[in-house]
Amino acid sequence: MSPKFNLLNLIYGCWLFCLLIPIFKLNCFGEESFNINLTRELKQGNFLIGLKQYLGAENDGLLERKNITFTTKNDFLELNSFNGVKHKSKKINIVFKKIALKTPLKVERLVFGPFASYESAQRKAENLREKGYEAQVAYPKDWEVWIPVDQKLPDKKFNYKLFEKSYDSKIIPFLVNEYSHQKLLGPIFISSSEEIIIDGINYGKKFYLAKDAYGTWTLIQKIQFDDYLKGVLPYEIGSNSPLEALKAQAVIARTWALYNSERFNIDQYHLCTNTQCQVYKPPKLKY
C-alpha cells in the first residue's frame, strides 16, 4: 500500500472526526434491532446503503435460481430474522421464492409521475402534503409520488393515475442448506466480525435484507459515515486529486448524503449506489 494512500486514509479520519456527529455505542454483535430506524441510524453515525435492489424480481440480475450467498474466510456469520430464525455458520445461502397467496392481494394507490429527478418528485410530494395528503416518494423504476387511494381525490389538474393490481403470490426469502429450508421474515440481519464476501465480492461486516415497497427485497449495507465517504470520493473526484480538493469534496459529499438521506425512506434505506445518488462502491470491495 502506497504512503500516499496511507496518508489519504489518515487525513480522511482526522478531517471526518472533526465533521461527524458523535457516534453512539452500537448494540452488541448479534443483538441488532429488527426494526430499521433510519433516523436512529443517522444519529449513530451510520448510513444504510441499498447495494442490490429489487431482489427476487424477474430481472433482478441474480442467477436463475435467485439466490444470494454470504461467506467468510475465518470467522462465523450470524443471521437473525424478524420471525426468530437464528443461524451461525461460515456460509449462508438465501433463496428467493414465489409463494402463492391463499387470497389475492389487491393493491391500489394514486400515482403522480414519473419525474425526471428525486428533487422534482420531492417538490410534488411536499406540495401534496401541504394540501393534506399523505404523499410518499417512491422509486419502482422511475421517481414517483404515491398517495393512498382512499383519500379524497385531488383535482384532475394534478395529473395523477390510478394504480390497481392484484397479486396472487409474494416473494419470500428462505435460508437454505443441505438439511433444511427455513422461511425468513424481514428485516433479516446478517453480520460478522470480519468482512463478508457476497456472491464472490468482498464487502463489509453488517447487512440487512429488507422488503421494499414493491414486493421485492433489498440488500442493505450498514456503514459508518467516514467509511461511506471513502467509498464515494475516489469515484466523485479521484483518489489522486490534491489533498485540499479531497478535503473539500469530503465536506460536499457528506453534506449531500445527509441532505438526501430520505430518498429511499419508503424502502427502509438512505441511499443507493448508482447515478440516482452519489456513485459509491464499498471501500473494502475487492474482486
Where are these regions (language model features)?
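Conserved, single-site charged/polar hotspot
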Residues: 2-287
